């Protein structure tokens, strides 16, 4: 065989890959394809994360809006409106009857005690808690002292009220103001005479204190 023929044969063998070369090429192509797949998966993860993040943002916005709406409705519901309590009834009555006696009676004293308890929580105990707290927390001993302090004050107020009712059964002021509130209850619907909330009670008392100072 001539040298030219040998060269052509060698050249043709280079052009036509052997089965082993083909297998190696397929493996290489497959490897390159797999090496690119993490990039695609990373991109897919980014898209999935962005979608999930958008859903969370929309959910957070919805929750915040719902909470705000609920707070607004609660504020509107407890803002007073046509609902009344003994404080508002008695102050309106006194404004129209300057000769009315001093406040007294079951409705007056029960409302006064409820007011005192509410005021203690919102003002006195809150201030005492802030003085004792460390990182927004207090010990059980501190909590117990706060509760007993409030109990002591309310116990004395209840004893005074019970003593008055026991030893002054015919108090004319009690009869007067109890009758005023009974007449009021006779003219209001059951819906309007619902139990007054702490917020309404505190607001009514503050309003009365302001009017009294003026």
Curated annotation (Swiss-Prot):
Region of interest: Disordered: 1-87, 192-214
Q: Known InterPro entries for this protein? A: Bocavirus_NP1
Location(s) in or outside the cell: Host nucleus
Instruction: Quote the biased-composition stretches of kind Basic and acidic residues, using this chain's numbering.
Output: 44-55
Q: Which GO terms describe its cellular component?
A: host cell nucleus
Any one Pfam family here would be NP1-WLL
Q: Which residues form a coiled coil?
A: none
Which keywords does this Swiss-Prot/TrEMBL entry list? Answer: Activator, Host nucleus, Transcription, Transcription regulation
One of the protein's GO biological processes: positive regulation of RNA splicing
Q: Where is the composition biased (Acidic residues)?
A: 192-201
Mainly resides where?
host cell
- Locations of Polar residues compositional bias? 56-71
Skewed-composition ranges (Basic residues): 33-43
Family per similarity comment: Belongs to the Bocaparvovirus Non-structural protein NP-1 family.
Its annotated function is as follows: Required for the expression of the capsid proteins. Performs the splicing and internal polyadenylation of the viral capsid-encoding mRNA precursor, which allows its maturation and expression. Transactivates the viral promoter.
Q: What is this protein called?
A: Non-structural protein NP-1
The opening ranks of the lineage are: Viruses, Monodnaviria, Shotokuvirae, Cossaviricota, Quintoviricetes
